[in-house]
Amino acid sequence: MASSSGSSPRPAPDENEFPFGCPPTVCQDPKEPRALCCAGCLSENPRNGEDQICPKCRGEDLQSISPGSRLRTQEKAHPEVAEAGIGCPFAGVGCSFKGSPQSVQEHEVTSQTSHLNLLLGFMKQWKARLGCGLESGPMALEQNLSDLQLQAAVEVAGDLEVDCYRAPCSESQEELALQHFMKEKLLAELEGKLRVFENIVAVLNKEVEASHLALATSIHQSQLDRERILSLEQRVVELQQTLAQKDQALGKLEQSLRLMEEASFDGTFLWKITNVTRRCHESACGRTVSLFSPAFYTAKYGYKLCLRLYLNGDGTGKRTHLSLFIVIMRGEYDALLPWPFRNKVTFMLLDQNNREHAIDAFRPDLSSASFQRPQSETNVASGCPLFFPLSKLQSPKHAYVKDDTMFLKCIVETST
């Protein structure tokens, strides 16, 4: 192109007059103050009416040259354009290669593995973002999908805006066809990426639905398990209460059986007392003041009685004598018996050498409340507070206590 004439500087082209890759001053010295791009080589060409071909390309038949060949023609006609370099088609996923169109084509062939790795990393990043949405729940996942669709639309709109910004002001049909081809290619790539993302989101949605179903099932089963556990715990408490009641009843039954085995039904009762030394010490210390014997009866359906022994004495015999009393107990057949109780009572401390038993007897005081029909479990004990001196209990002449054991006998007169 001819060098610029005149002293007025050539203004920069309008921003819509240069396509991408068209340097602003490839062809110098335009004849007009305004310039546009050569339809053949994308180089700057002076605006001179209908002449849209720069002098370097005017010798070529541009109508018969394909877009790819036209680029090679541009490289030959304007090597400075090729030296400027173009980016790799995979720059959007991280490839930083730039060069001439031929070197870019060779780069695409030789760098397929690295491009696949870049695409893989790109997809992993999107998958991670989608995974975050999955962990946050379906609402967050739908929001991520909307964001992706919006971002893809923005990218498409941005690319279209850039293309429009860089669209050549030439009205050449070939250039318009090339631009349309590039736009369609970019749109196809973005649509392909969007379809991939939509497929990924669809799969993740299915997984989310399956997870929600499994979670709902698990929650329902957990609720059933909790209700079952509560029911079993309540049942265990009931069984424990029942078991405690049965243990108590069994204890009473065993005690009753033992008492029945030890009881007599003829008015005569023999009471064996073991650990006499320890029991005397406990009585003297006030720890165990008195001892009760098992119950016995004057007959099978007669009076129910028991003995009460104070090893350290009671009343007038405290600390000096054994005090022995009889206790009228409430029986099952009291309503059929004559009251007050009037049978003679005889106490005996047995000499285990059978030499000299200690004996004391008395007849009931019919006016005493101790011998009236019992209104509680037991009446007040009555008997002999000075039954036997403590000083003679360990006498070597007698065996009232032998092997730390002594025997007391009670005889209730049954004939009236």
From Swiss-Prot:
Q: Which keywords label this protein? A: Apoptosis, Coiled coil, Isopeptide bond, Phosphoprotein, Ubl conjugation
User: What post-translational changes are documented for it?
Assistant: Polyubiquitinated by BIRC2 and/or BIRC3, leading to its subsequent proteasomal degradation. Ubiquitinated by the SCF(FBXL2) complex, leading to its degradation by the proteasome.
Q: Which CDD domains match?
A: MATH_TRAF1
Its BP terms in the Gene Ontology are: apoptotic process; positive regulation of NF-kappaB transcription factor activity; protein-containing complex assembly; regulation of canonical NF-kappaB signal transduction; regulation of extrinsic apoptotic signaling pathway; tumor necrosis factor-mediated signaling pathway
Any one GO MF annotation of this record: signaling adaptor activity
Region described as Disordered: 1-24
Site feature Cleavage: at which residues? D163, C164
User: Which positions bear Phosphoserine?
Assistant: S146
Instruction: Say where the cross-link Glycyl lysine isopeptide (Lys-Gly) (interchain with G-Cter in ubiquitin) occurs.
Output: K185, K193
Task: Fill in the domain comment.
Answer: The coiled coil domain mediates homo- and hetero-oligomerization.
Protein name from the UniProt record: TNF receptor-associated factor 1
Q: Which gene encodes it?
A: TRAF1
